[in-house]
């Protein structure tokens, strides 16, 4: 790739981030904001699976707001009108300690992005739920990216989880690259600010 081509790609990314930032800042419907965030995450990574969680006002749980898996033609929450009936995730255990067992609760509690190449080879987090889902459906969870939505005050308002990035040419599952992660971190920050502003207006 030539320097000119690299510059063109960079300019396109900056323009796209500006466009999505404007869209997020002017939208009033919170469900549409959810969809804008996750739709752009899909554009950046070509991820097959996407889940968006929002942290409760008491900061003890995370509610599922969007769940989607392209290859299974599955979508709930957001603007679909289909309620997600999965219980919220607990951010603390019974003793009051931060729950770091799953990558999304870890991201919520620490503010750190987690990028995993293969969930089945990962020893640091509990992927029992994903493996059970895979066993029941024939799916194969592989690459996983968990990103906290951190606003301008450094408060974490939610977490975005992306599953199975896809190569746009071959369609094969690939890892989330460092470049993808950087762009998603930027998107998550924009989304967090928009959601925080929406909550402030609602109050």
Each language-model region and where it sits:
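Signal-transmission linkers at sensory-effector interfaces
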Residues: 1-36, 43-44, 197-203
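Short, hydrophobic-rich beta-strand element in sensory/regulatory alpha-beta domains
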Residues: 39-42, 48-56, 60-64, 104-106, ...
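Flexible loop/coil segments at beta-strand boundaries within sensory signal-transduction domains
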Residues: 58-59, 150-156, 165-168, 182, ...
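Signal-transmission/dimerization alpha-helices at domain junctions
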Residues: 109-113, 159, 182-203
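A short, aliphatic-rich beta-strand micro-motif
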Residues: 142-151, 158
């Amino acid at each position: 790739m030539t320097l000119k081509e690299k510059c063109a790609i960079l300019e396109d990314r900056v323009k796209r981030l500006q466009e999505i930032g404007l869209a997020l800042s002017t939208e009033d419907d919170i469900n549409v904001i959810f969809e804008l965030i996750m739709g752009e995450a899909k554009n950046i990574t070509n991820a097959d699976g996407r889940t968006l969680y929002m942290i409760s006002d008491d900061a003890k749980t995370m509610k599922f707001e969007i769940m989607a898996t392209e290859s299974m033609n599955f979508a709930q929450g957001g603007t679909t009108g289909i309620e997600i009936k999965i219980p919220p995730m607990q951010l603390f255990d019974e003793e009051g300690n931060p729950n770091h067992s799953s990558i999304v609760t870890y991201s919520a509690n620490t503010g750190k992005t987690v990028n995993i190449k293969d969930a089945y080879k990962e020893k640091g987090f509990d992927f029992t739920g994903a493996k059970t889902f895979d066993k029941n459906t024939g799916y194969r969870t592989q690459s996983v990216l968990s990103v906290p939505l951190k606003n301008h005050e450094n408060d974490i308002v939610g977490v975005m989880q992306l599953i199975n990035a896809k190569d746009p040419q071959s369609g094969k599952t690939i890892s989330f690259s460092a470049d993808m992660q950087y762009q998603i971190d930027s998107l998550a920050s924009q989304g967090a600010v928009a959601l925080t502003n929406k909550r402030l207006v609602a109050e």
